[in-house]
């Protein structure tokens, strides 16, 4: 995400981004982050 943000900046509004479980708890890692702007995006 950092790499994408550095290249293309942030979009509004914030959105919940869920990552695959990085631990043995098996829960999705969901946190509020800025949407990532893709080049050519209409948003």
From Swiss-Prot:
Disulfide bonds join 4-36, 11-30, 18-37. GO terms for cellular component: extracellular region. Keywords: Antimicrobial, Disulfide bond, Ion channel impairing toxin, Myotoxin, Neurotoxin, Potassium channel impairing toxin, Secreted, Toxin, Voltage-gated potassium channel impairing toxin. The keyword Disulfide bond applies. It is found in: Secreted. One of its GO terms (biological process) is envenomation resulting in occlusion of the pore of voltage-gated potassium channel in another organism. Pfam families: Myotoxins. Expressed by the venom gland. One of its GO terms (molecular function) is potassium channel regulator activity. Cationic peptide that possesses multiple functions. It acts as a cell-penetrating peptide (CPP), and as a potent voltage-gated potassium channel (Kv) inhibitor. It exhibits antimicrobial activities, hind limb paralysis, and severe muscle necrosis by a non-enzymatic mechanism. Belongs to the crotamine-myotoxin family. Monomer. This is Myotoxin-1. It comes from Crotalus concolor (Midget faded rattlesnake). The lineage of its organism: Eukaryota, Metazoa, Chordata, Craniata, Vertebrata.
